[in-house]
Amino acid sequence: MENNNNDVQLIKIEAVVREEMFIDVKKALTDIGVNGITAYQVVGCGIQRGMSEYVRGQKVDVQVLPKIKFEIVVSSEEWERKTIEAIKKTAFTGNPGDGKIFTYYLKQAVKIRTGETGYDAIQTPNFDD
């Protein structure tokens, strides 16, 4: 039976972590073999609603805090589990604000340059060919 790579269910993982965890989380993902990562700076808050700081002696409630958001697309529940575990292990401090991880099933992925879709769109090319 022929294996159709486009029948693979793609899973998108979004992780929002502390800004200072960027390098460690990126390294952990690379170390387990994740080869496609999008990361960008965001601001946000959880149920704690940010934090309080003192500016010129006045208490100021900071409503949002700087974070890093990672977006990763994987091709199996095993990769989803491995990716989540790597992020959790690396980003954990045990304090409020460690972040959140969300997963979604993707309807489609398209590589703009080649037109490849689904599983084929997220694979790293072999530049030796």
What function would you assign to each model-found segment?
Residues 1-129:
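Positively charged, small/polar-rich N-terminal and surface patches that mediate targeting and assembly
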